[in-house]
Amino acid sequence: MTVAPPSPNSPAAELQQRPPRYPGEDTTPTSKREIWGWYAYGIAAEVFAVCGVGSFLPLTLEQLAREQGTFKSSHLPCVGPGSPSTSVNGTAPAMLRRDEAENDQCVVGLLGLNINTASFAMYTFSLAVLVQALTLISFSALADYENNRKTLLLAFGFIGSATSMLFVFIAPPIFVLGALLVVIGVTCLGSSFVVLNSFLPVLVANDPSIEKASKPAEELHPMSPDGEYIHPRDSFSASDAESGPHPAAEAGSGTSSGPASPELQLSTRISSKGVGLGYCAAVLVQILSISLLFTLSKTSISKVSGTLPLRFVLLLVGIWWFSFTMVTRKWLRARPGPPLNTANTGGQVKRWRVWLRLVGFAWKSLWKTVKIAVQLREVLVFLAAWFLLSDAMATVSGTAILFARTELKMSTTLVGLLSITATLSGMAGAFLWPVVSRRFGLKSNHTIMLCIALFEIIPLYGMLAYIPVFKKWGVIGLQQPWEIFPLAIVHGVVSGGLSSYCRSFFGLLIPPGSEAAFYALYAATDKGSSVIGPAIVGMLIDATGQVRSGFFFIAPLILMPIPLIWIVNAEKGRREGVAMAQRLEKGHETEMSEQTEEAEGLLARGI
C-alpha cells in the first residue's frame, strides 16, 4: 500500500526533518513504534537463524540421512534393526543415542555417490547459500523503489516460516525433500535480512534526534525498468564532499580521531539492540525447544522416528517466525522509494514480462553497483575482508554443531544447551562491544579486528588434539564434550560484535541514496563466500571421515581478513561515497542534456 505523507497540520509534520527527495517519499519522523516494528522482524527471523540454521536444522538433516544410511565398511544400517547403535528395544532416539561405531562412517547414497551424513548437511547449506545469493541479487535491489522494500520483507518472512513448519511432514525416506526445504528457508532468511538492513539507513535518516543541515534536499526521480536513470537520483548536494572530512569517520585507520557522527552512533545503537533482542528471542525459543525435546523423549513419539521431536521443534520455530512477522507487517512503515516505471507506452504489459524486466533490472542494478564499488577503494577492501570473514563465520557455525554431534557424540539436548550458551554469549556481546569500544576508545575497525583475533581461538584449540601428548591425555583440544562450552561462549561474544559492527561500519561507506543496492552487494558477498567454506569442509569430512579436519581450513581463513580491515579508512571512504554520488549526478545531467539536444535537433529538421 502507498503511505501518504503527514498532513501539514499534524504533529508529525512539525517534527519533519527534511523535505521529500522524490514524489511520494514518506519523510514522517521515525517513531518508537516503527523502530519496534523493525526490531520485531529480527526477533522473528533470528529464532530461525539460531534455533533452526544454527542448531536443529543441521542435526535434523544429518539424522534424516543417518536413518536412511549404512556404515561404510560393514554396510549395516546406521539406525534401526541390525545397527550397532540400536538399543535393546530396536530404537535409537536422536536425542539419547551415542554411536558405538567409533571408527566407521555413516554414509547415504545420493546421485550414485556415498556421502557422509555430516557432509550431506554441509553440502545442503552450501547449496542453500548459493541459491540465496542468486535470489537476493534478483530481488533485493528492487527494495529501493516503490513499496517493494516492505513487500519483499513480508514475502520472504511468510514463505520462510512456512518451510520451517513443513518440516513436520518430512520423514527419513524423503530426506532429500528436507534438503529442499532448507534451501528455500535459508534463502528466505538471508534475503529478508538484506531487505531489513536496507530499512536501517532510512529509519536513521528520518529520526527526530538527527539534526539535518538547513539546506534543500536534492530530488530523487524514477528509474526505468531497463536500469537507466530517467533523472539523477541523489540525496546530497555537491557541497557535501567539498566541506571536508565527514564527522562520521571515527572508524578508520586514518588520522581522524573525531567523534562518530550522530547518524553512525544511532545506527550502531539500533543495530546492536536489534541483534541483542534477536538473541533474547532465540534463547527463549531454544529453552522452549529443549523442554519440548525432553518432554517428547518421555513419550512414544521419539520411537516412531528419531527425527520427529526435532521436526516438532522446527514447527515451533516456524510458528514463532510467522507470528512476529505479522507484528512487523502492522508496525513497520513501508517507506516507499521512487517509482519504477513498468508500463509499456503501447498498453498493458503482461505480468510475466514485468517480472522478467524487474529481475533483469535487479541484475543490471547490481552490476552498476559493482562498477561503482570497484571505484571506491575503501568499499572494495572492506568487501574483500567481509568475503573471507563471513565465510569463516558460516563455516565455523555449521562445523561446530556437526562436530559436537558426530565427534563428541553429544545428545541433541546437549547440543541445544550448547546453542543456548552461544546465543546468550552473542546477546551479551551485542551489548558489550559498544561499551568496550567506548571505554578503550577503539575505532570500529579495531573492534572488528579484536573480534576476529578472539575468533581464531576456536580452530586453534580444536587442532591441539593432533599433538600426541594431548591426544594421549584424552583431554584438551576438544576431546571431551565439556570443552566445547567455553568455546561456545567465545563464539557467541565474537559473533554478537561482528554482526552489529560490520553491518553499521559498511553503512558508513555506502554512497548516499543507494542503501538497498549496496546492502544487496554486501549480502551477495556474504552468501557468495559462504558457499565455499562448508563445501570444502564437507569434502574434507568425506576424505578423512573426521569433522575435526575442517579446522585446518578454518584457522587460516579466519586470520586473512585482519590486514584488510586494518587498512580501511572510514573517513576517506565516506568522502569517496559522497564524491561518487556527485559524479553520478553530473553524468546523468550530461546524459539528459545530450538527449534533450538530440530531440531538439530532430524537431528542427522536422523529423
Swiss-Prot record:
Locations listed in the record = Vacuole membrane
Which keywords appear in this protein's UniProt record, sorted alphabetically?
Amino-acid transport, Autophagy, Glycoprotein, Membrane, Transmembrane, Transmembrane helix, Transport, Vacuole
Q: What is a GO molecular function of this protein?
A: transmembrane transporter activity
Stretches the record annotates as Disordered: 1-29, 235-263, 586-607
Q: Where is the composition biased (Low complexity)?
A: 247-263
Task: Tell me where the transmembrane regions lie.
Answer: 41-61, 119-139, 151-170, 188-208, 274-294, 307-327, 379-399, 415-435, 450-470, 485-507, 519-541, 550-570
Membrane topology is: Multi-pass membrane protein
GO cellular component, alphabetical, reads: vacuolar membrane
Q: What is one Pfam family matched by this protein? A: ATG22
Classify the main location.
Answer: membrane
Q: Which residues are glycosylated?
A: 89, 445
Report the leader peptide range. Answer: none
InterPro entries on file: Atg22, Atg22-like, ATG22/LtaA_families, MFS_dom, MFS_trans_sf
Is Transmembrane a UniProt keyword of this protein? yes
Some GO term, biological process aspect, for this entry: which one? amino acid transmembrane export from vacuole
Question: What is the recorded function of this protein according to its Swiss-Prot or TrEMBL entry?
Answer: Vacuolar effluxer which mediate the efflux of amino acids resulting from autophagic degradation. The release of autophagic amino acids allows the maintenance of protein synthesis and viability during nitrogen starvation.
Recorded family membership: Belongs to the ATG22 family.
Q: What is this protein called?
A: Autophagy-related protein 22-2
The species this protein belongs to is Aspergillus oryzae (strain ATCC 42149 / RIB 40) (Yellow koji mold)
